[in-house]
Amino acid sequence: MGVGGGEMTLHASSASQLPSNPYQSMCKTNRSGKASLLSHQQMEQFLSNLPVKYGLLAELMYFSAGRVKEITTLKVRNINIKDELLTIEKSSTKTKETRQIPLPPRLVKSLGIWIQENQLETDDFIFFTDSRNMNVRRGEKSISTQSVDTFFRKAFDWIGIEGASTHSFRRTRLTELHVDEGWSLREIMDISGHKSIISLQQYLDTDKKNTFEKYRNLFQREEV
């Protein structure tokens, strides 16, 4: 299922669609706040302006709710095409624990095509660096988290999405699971990889006004 309950369309575009002139770096509020959440419309708009590699990166970060390092260091062996399952190895996770996450069939198919077209081997990085200054073969070295962060900030800036970063995909997805889908914090932890509920709660964005209203409605039902 894509964003908004429908199909989230990935448009393969050219990197030249992004202006070549320098950008003002996008940042979190005062560099100490949380990355902005993305609406379904913003997600669609963002994906439609990305080259295939970065589009796949963005979709994987969203659907897996993974950290940027976890996704940039994925290898071909981490995608189970048959079972439509992603394995994030403990060597890449913040908690040093391996976890598995289901992926939507369409995204798995797109990843399979990407892997095949680039002739990647089992131990190759899916999102490899293609820098001409590095004497490495395709798939041998992963793209850096810094280059992904820089690219995405420029893309967000160009289309006018304020306060967003690579962290927005993870935070948006976890908030949707909790607020829109009604998942418990314990259930979300199986996807997010958080070790504690407290650390997970810091990621989630809830509507305090709506929370207060629900609590007042409880008073009425209890007749207190």
Please provide the spans of the model-predicted regions.
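Short, charged phosphate-coordinating catalytic segments
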Residues: M61-K82, R186
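C-terminal catalytic core of tyrosine-transesterase DNA break-rejoin enzymes
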Residues: F63, T172-S192, Q201
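C-terminal catalytic core of Y-nucleophile DNA break-rejoin enzymes
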Residues: T93-I113, D124-R153
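C-terminal secondary-structure termini that scaffold catalytic or DNA-interacting sites
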Residues: M1-L37, L218-V224
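Catalytic-site neighborhood detector that most strongly recognizes the C-terminal catalytic loop/helix
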Residues: S92, S192-N217
